[in-house]
Amino acid sequence: MMEAPASTSSREPLAAELGPAPARLPLDSMFSPITDQLRYLLRKADDFQSYLLYSRDRVQKEQLAKAMPTFLTMCEPYFLYLEAAARSVPPIYGALQELVRKGLLEISQQLTLRLEQLVLMYASFGFVDLEETNPLSISCFFCGRFSISPSHDVSIFRYCTPAAYTASHFPRYLYKKMRWNLETTTEASSQGADSHVDYYFLCYRDTWEDAGQGPANSCPQIQKLWSIGRWMPLGPAEDDLDSWILCPQPPGDYQQLLTIGFEEPSHVLATDLLVQILLGQAGPARPPSAAGPAAWAAPAS
């Protein structure tokens, strides 16, 4: 019988001292239930599409269109998990966080684009309204929520088709594609927690507006200049209840914070850029509503 090398016995006390290595769940096993749920939701979306394209029963199509908001709501807990697990601070997966983050956000983007495609298809057949001023429309849908600090939560919404920034089309030629609600919670001394919401948008502006030209005499190739900005309310005052009741839509302006360029950013990249803006300008512990417009102004880059 061969004797074990002497070096083996010298390493045994070290191994015993360190103890057994902690078992790591393989990434494939970790993602298995997540991808299973994705496949389930994608199959549901395929069913909605198949009935629309191949069924001759118009009543059934109308019923499915009415069920569309329910299906989108059914996807919300999944989006909540994906975005919170990928982006929330502090990270929950340790050294694997970046790999997990990339995988989760790819899944989130895949489902987001599929749902957008489905809603647009139903709208093209006249079964779904995309007009934001209609309370029964599906102009946008919820795509997740995550925390950037204990007192700051970000909710993501995506517009199925670019919508005018306001119903009054002011600012002119400005269209929104995504919205983020930044909810800031502050501790009130006697009444518990208080919260405030700021709104941020991914928008594009037709470039002939910047050149001082109108649609009638602009060049045929109109480019879209993408940016991220913040909703700046112009009234009514928060405590003026009568004015709020009589106001069809509160007026607001667009405070551009970051110029992105002529290529539309992906769903994931746009949210990454917003997080950089929030953390870089105000810091995760400072509510943006406490800063005036000058404190939030950023040079376009």
UniProtKB/Swiss-Prot annotation:
Pfam families membership: DUF3314 (PF11771)
Top-level division of the source organism's lineage: Eukaryota
Any one GO biological process: in utero embryonic development
Family stated for the protein in its record: Belongs to the UPF0575 family.
Designated name of the protein: UPF0575 protein C19orf67 homolog
Species the sequence originates in: Mus musculus (Mouse)
Upper classification of the organism: Eukaryota, Metazoa, Chordata, Craniata, Vertebrata
